Amino acid sequence: AQKGKTYDEGLIDDFLENVYYLAFDSTNADEYYKLRERIEFLQEKHDLPDKIIYYLATPPVMYEIVPQCLLESGLNKTESPDGFRRIIIEKPFGTSLESARQLNDHLRHIFHEEEIYRIDHYLGKETVQNILVLRFSNGIFEPLWNHNYIDSIEISATETLGVENRGKYYDGAGAMRDMIQNHLMQLMSFIAMESPSIFEPEPIRDEIVKVFRSIRPYTVLDMDKMVVRGQYIGYREEKNVAPDSNTETYVAMKFFIDNWRWSGVPFYFYTGKKLPEKSSEVVIHFKSTPHQLFVGQCSGGSCNKLNESISLKFGLKMPGAGFEVKQVSMDFRYDSLSKSYLPDAYERLLLDAMLGDSTLYARSDALEASWKFIDPILLHWKEEGSKNLFFYEPGEDGPEETVILGAEKKVCACQRR
């Protein structure tokens, strides 16, 4: 049934007739015979091929236990030449570089890499997928997509809510692990990657890995000058949060990618909870003309978007006497393209897994490369304790210390003052 739409109850009934629930102890390999019997029964009843996907929407502690039980019960492989076994795993993919490597090694001992699907729902969003199409199918953009024409790039994901009922998980994760290591890093890779030789999963994922490996590592001095962590006032009073917690609910960071395309171009990440607006954005700031004739006249406006969209802004002369310049937008909104239903991010990603298309799923080497960049920051924060943890009021734009990143004149108007 489409959200907000009428639907055929008969179709829903037909679908639900083929949905089954099975209760068993998923930590005990001896119990998995129940799952095997149910699979074999349903395959025979409906004449189904031996094609099975295991989806682990479970606590992270189960990411090693369940695959091990599948191995011990023989459910990790198929004897059918036309069959397959695939496993989908939700984030977090480890909590550090070491734990990510351990998890990857464990999974690859049980499944082949091409059978492992590490899901990030951000990559299932239509606008995110359209980044690649926008870049590589339009001759107007790709020649400009480099350090010669781009001044800086901002990628942000902000929320108005706090941790709500996720205090136990969030206090052990924080904004860096929860948002930046996966969602924002993946978004950045689509913005920064080189064109793949062909539009197929492995060439695309090869280019993503190259981007992650090209990020300039931080020195300890860099971490203090280029990374800001914050915590909203009242976080320590949240349910299941330690009263002396140093977990960050806000991160702003500046970094560079050391390759030809992005030499000298600063990238910025912003993410946080209890901020003024809920928004996910990628903002490309193009360089100004060498000689500014209309200084101060091309002012920016609100860039609030309630729908998925792509917007290109440029200055034009207003009608009438004089040369009053106004910033105007050329917008593309998905809801104006078609009245047909836009699939949810998970719908797209689950269908891809069924079809064996891993383009929008994280590969193990990309995962480890992203952790290699993030891990030193987390270790530095652990050593510092509460030092350089800045507090901000709920509903504000985050800690004032964010200005040390030097982006205060470039940041998006709808995110920060």
Where in the sequence are the language-model features?
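Secretory/organelle targeting and membrane-embedding segments
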Residues: 1-89, 93-417
